[in-house]
Amino acid sequence: MAEGSEKVPIARAGPEDVEQGLPPAYTAAVPPPGPGRLLKAGATVLIAGALLLLAGAIGAFYFWKATERQVYNVHYTMSINGKVQDGSMEIDAGNNLETFKTGSGSEEAVEVHDFQIGITGIRFAGGEKCYIKAQPKARVPEVDAMTKASLSSDLEDEIMPVRFDENSLIWVAADEPIKHNGFLSPKILELCGDLPIFWLRPTYPKDKQRERREMKRNKRQSESNFDAEHRAAAAEEVNTRSTPTQLTQDLGPQSNETRPMQQESDQTLNPDNPYNQLEGEGMAFDPMLDHLGVCCIECRRSYTQCQRICEPLLGYYPWPYNYQGCRTACRIIMPCSWWVARIMGVV
């Protein structure tokens, strides 16, 4: 009877099975999966893949829109010593960065302004060093498409003028590189790569230093003369204050008649617009903005500012000079009115 059974035991019941009351295992014929089950599995995989692709497309679209709003590039041309070179400016409002590139190939210079930490990084193509210097901290606001188009048209229509004075400020690298770079941002670390990083210190030629001392001396003298004249004028005003009553009466109606015209002209201008404030001399800019090269106070148009980055000569300072191997890095300088308008979000 056991030989004619269709079920063949493949394992004998062990002691554990006996204790647990489990029957011995038998082989059983498993039917193959039908085509309907395979179709369902394939449809599930296709639907899941389509949903993943749709989610990825939506995420990429929103990421592109956000990046397009916060980062934009402007290309321009400039003439340096009679040679026309290409330049570009990239403003990254999301990371509070500005990047300037000058030249191409072995003559390329890259300058990164990190307004978050207040440090500028400079690197030259083929150079063996990377340079950093301090800069003012600021906040780069987002710029809409209309402002991008107007700024691009202003910079791309003509060759940018270049200001490069041989007797101006010179940046000389320190003798030793920095030992710790933990205070630098990822963008500047990416710019420098594996190169040693050196601080830049400002240096003026000897003739320029003499001129600066003379300017400071003349400024102090002019301020002292102005104070003396101001005191004399104040004393004279006190002595003559009680006499010109008739002149005040004659000028009173005239000033009242012209006052509505003054108010009407003021209403035609937006008092919150920095450009209008500058026209009326109602906005004063810090001279350090111009000195540090952040913007130009007296300019109405942008221009390209070039600076010399030099290596220390390790000689006697300041005669005849203490630097060598100078290279040029250029970037665009905008008017201070445009700069302040950006910070205030007007443009």
Swiss-Prot record:
Coiled coil: none annotated. PROSITE patterns: BRICHOS. Residues 1-29, 208-281 are annotated as: Disordered. Residues 210-213 form a propeptide. It holds the Pfam family BRICHOS. The chain crosses the membrane at residues 45-65. Residues 240-276 have a biased composition (Polar residues). After cleavage, the post-translationally modified ChM-I is secreted as a glycoprotein. InterPro entries: BRICHOS_dom (IPR007084), Chondromodulin/Tenomodulin (IPR043405). Keywords: Chondrogenesis, Cleavage on pair of basic residues, Developmental protein, Differentiation, Disulfide bond, Extracellular matrix, Glycoprotein, Membrane, Secreted, Transmembrane, Transmembrane helix. Glycans are attached at N256. GO terms for biological process: cartilage development; cell differentiation; negative regulation of angiogenesis; negative regulation of endothelial cell proliferation. GO terms for cellular component: endomembrane system; extracellular region; membrane. Disulfide bonds join C130-C192, C295-C299, C296-C336, C306-C330, C310-C326. Residues 103-200 form the BRICHOS domain. Expressed in the cartilage and in fetal precartilaginous tissues as well as in heart and eye. Bifunctional growth regulator. May contribute to the rapid growth of cartilage and vascular invasion prior to the replacement of cartilage by bone during endochondral bone development. Plays a role as antiangiogenic factor in cardiac valves to suppress neovascularization. This is Leukocyte cell-derived chemotaxin 1. It comes from Gallus gallus.
